[in-house]
Design a protein with these regions (language model features):
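Acidic, low-complexity intrinsically disordered segments
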Residues: 4-264, 268-269
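Short amphipathic alpha-helices and their capping/turn segments at secondary-structure boundaries
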Residues: 16-29, 317-328, 359-361, 391-395
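Flexible glycine/acidic-rich beta-alpha junction loops that bind and position SAM and/or redox cofactors
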Residues: 42-43, 146-153, 178-179, 236, ...
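Short helix-capping segments at alpha-helix termini
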Residues: 74-77, 132-137, 296-303, 367-368, ...
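Short, electropositive alpha-helical surface patch
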Residues: 94-99, 289-295, 364, 383-400
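Structural recognition of alpha->loop->beta junctions
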Residues: 155-180, 323-332, 389-405
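Radical SAM [4Fe-4S] cluster-binding motif and immediate context
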Residues: 206-372, 377-379, 385
Length: 428
């Protein structure tokens, strides 16, 4: 058993108020923040990198927006110059020489922030973190893997302990309301091994909105595509899901007024197509005012379209489909997961009604919206024959436009993963 890791959360330190944040000492005049989305290794151990990316990282955009807010408020001192460098390792190399030069420069603090790290990226993120920490660079790591492991195993796990033992700072949970304080710890050279914010997820009202950086978007095939999370959390209880144990089951939502200026600024730099990264936009209590905002912007002469993730029952919300169409929704991603009721019951996905799937797709099609479904293979009642028949039915009976197939995976942060660990089941 790994010895327990310290849980470091001082609610006064991480309050929005600036009185708890210590400015940078006078001898520190520059802070360079490398916001890094790590890539992943393929099955043969090679690093995956593309000539152009497909979907930009919303986490990088969130942290860029939070950093811009810190800069504007000058809470770390009027003398401190803050620079932000976005690095998406899936489309570019780590700027190793520049990072080491900044880290060694007198009067400068540099920090590498491995952001939004998912489980399939964690091995690569660990290698990056250990390499730079061994060279004396300050390193922080956050995202769903470390947050999920901390949420489900608060006593500590070997992968987290390996990082903290090497001097890497682990951040579990969301950092709105805490980012300035974390950066204060960077410039004052007092980073802690672990910050656990999972118990107090921040409200999103009046928070800085994700900022799309044009220089970052140039590395993507669709350069007019941006991301925004208008809400976080999900009210359902699927056993394979990590969202509910990291972001919680209580929906936390942005308001339309918080989004307006950012959408206009993004439009002025060529961003007019969005992917709402909310796990379930339909359960955002402010969905109608947000769609009204987009309708108004379109009526003002801006042509804005978007894709969103929703649940299978979203079409039953009065006015939701019609207003989504008017606002410019081109595609919905629906968590169908299975057309076998026994599989859905086993996964705790009781909100799905297989008998209603075809009608749901028809309603969205009647509105001119394409339906892309997520489908999981490997549930207890799947067989090779049943899966083949499911694929046929998706096309012939459900008439979905597109399906993405996923192998059932016990992701850290899910109930499935915790159960398998506690039962001593083997996992790769």
């Amino acid at each position: 058993m790994v010895s327990p890791l310290p849980v470091l959360e001082d609610k006064t330190l991480f309050a929005r108020g600036d009185t708890s944040i210590t400015p940078a000492p006078e001898e520190i005049s520059r802070l360079v923040i490398y916001l890094v989305k790590p890539s992943r290794y393929d099955d043969d151990g090679y690093l995956v990198r593309h000539w152009r990316g497909v979907l930009p990282s919303n986490t990088l955009s969130c942290l860029a927006g939070l950093t811009d807010d810190v800069v504007q408020r000058k809470v770390l001192g009027k003398h401190l110059k803050i620079s932000t460098v976005l690095v998406d390792e899936s489309v570019e190399r780590m700027p190793r020489r520049k990072i080491l030069a900044d880290a060694g420069r007198k009067g400068t603090r540099a920090v590498v922030c491995l952001a939004g790290v998912q489980t399939n990226q964690f091995a690569r993120a660990t290698d990056i973190a250990l390499e730079y920490a061994s060279l004396g660079v300050r390193v922080m790591i956050g995202g769903f893997h470390v947050s999920g492991m901390t949420a489900m195993f608060p006593e500590g796990t070997p992968d987290i302990a390996r990082l903290t033992d090497a001097g890497v700072t682990v951040v579990a949970g969301e950092v709105e309301d805490r980012w300035a304080a974390l950066l204060s710890d960077v410039v004052n050279d007092r980073l802690q091994p672990l910050y656990n914010f999972l118990a107090t997820p921040p409200e999103l009202k009046r928070q800085p909105v994700p900022r799309v950086k044009r220089s970052y978007m140039k590395r993507f095939a669709v350069s007019n595509l941006g991301t925004i999370d208008t809400s976080r959390g999900c009210p359902f209880a699927c056993t394979f899901c990590t969202i509910i144990n990291v972001q919680g089951r209580k929906m936390r939502c942005r308001e339309a007024s918080d989004l307006r200026n950012t959408i206009i600024e993004n439009y002025n730099q060529g961003i007019n197509f969005y992917f709402f990264t909310d796990d379930n936009f339909a359960r955002n209590k402010n969905w109608e005012s947000i769609l009204d905002l987009i309708i108004d912007l379109n009526n003002e002469g801006r042509h804005i379209t978007f894709m969103m993730q929703i649940d299978v029952r979203a079409y039953k919300i009065p006015g939701f489909v019609e207003k989504s169409k008017r606002a410019g929704c081109s595609q919905v991603f629906v968590g169908m997961e299975s057309i076998n009721p026994d599989n859905l019951k086993a996964a705790g996905k009781t909100q799905n009604d297989v008998g209603d799937y075809a009608h749901m797709v028809e309603v969205w099609h009647d509105a001119g919206v394409a339906v892309h479904v997520g489908y999981i293979i490997g549930f207890p009642f799947d067989t090779p024959e049943s899966v083949a028949d499911d694929v046929r039915r998706l096309a012939d009976e459900m008439k979905v436009d597109q399906a993405s197939f996923f192998m059932l995976t016990p992701l850290p942060g899910s109930v499935d993963h915790k159960r398998m660990v506690e039962n001593g089941e083997e996992m790769d």
